[in-house]
Amino acid sequence: MASPSSLCLLTALLALVSWQTIASDPSPLQDFCVADEHSPVLVNGFACLDPKHVNADHFFKAAMLDTPRKTNKVGSNVTLINVMQIPGLNTLGISIARIDYAPLGQNPPHTHPRATEILTVLEGTLYVGFVTSNPNNTLFSKVLKKGDVFVFPVGLIHFQFNPNPHQPAVAIAALSSQNPGAITIANAVFGSKPPISDEVLAKAFQVEKGTIDWLQAQFWENNHY
């Protein structure tokens, strides 16, 4: 008969395994589960298309990720390829993105609530970093050159900035979810619909309400496409 300490250890291990299971996209239980975007079934992700109706195009996208993208007023453009563009990604737990940065452009502070990101620089130089959770809020940052790789842990606020005033930069990122999501901090806080009470934000940021009103009146650019 197992001792009480052995049972406690087994319980702890089962809890850890269960937590790891729910902490990322579900693992596939068959070769593939192509997303059926027209299915009336509501699940966490997409229902599976009948395998008899699956073909190679469900795993393909002529995305032209080698083609430069036009940037916007924050100086970047994120072209994400996820399950919405390639239905064959359903249950596979991965996406990819091309990020173009104008000179002095940035991918502003944001989080991916459902994915870790690994980024590699294809052209140019990037100053990148992420901030840990409360209470320390430690910044881990690095200047990356062509060919360098950096990891942003799941859910943490992170950013990329092109410090070169004359040359653009390009990066490719892989994300550990078929649908990683993106929450741009400034957009979410100051551009929410309906707006967050200026009294709440003034207290949170320790500024006058007039400053918050001005910030909420701005157009907050979305650079994720």
UniProtKB/Swiss-Prot annotation:
Main location, first listed in the record: secreted
SUPFAM superfamilies: RmlC-like cupins
SMART domains for the chain: Cupin_1
GO molecular function: manganese ion binding
One cellular-component annotation, GO: apoplast
Keywords (A to Z) from UniProt: Apoplast, Disulfide bond, Glycoprotein, Manganese, Metal-binding, Secreted, Signal
Subcellular location: Secreted, Extracellular space, Apoplast
Binding site for Mn(2+): H110, H112, E117, H158
InterPro entries listed in its UniProt record: Cupin_1, Germin, Germin_Mn-BS, RmlC-like_jellyroll, RmlC_Cupin_sf
Subunit record text: Oligomer (believed to be a pentamer but probably hexamer).
Role played: Plays a role in broad-spectrum disease resistance. Probably has no oxalate oxidase activity even if the active site is conserved.
Something else known: Member of the 12 germin-like protein gene cluster located on chromosome 8 in the major-effect quantitative trait loci (QTL) for fungal blast resistance. Partial suppression of the 12 germin-like protein genes increases susceptibility to the fungal pathogens causing rice blast and sheath blight diseases.
Protein name, per record: Germin-like protein 8-6
Species of origin: Oryza sativa subsp. japonica (Rice)
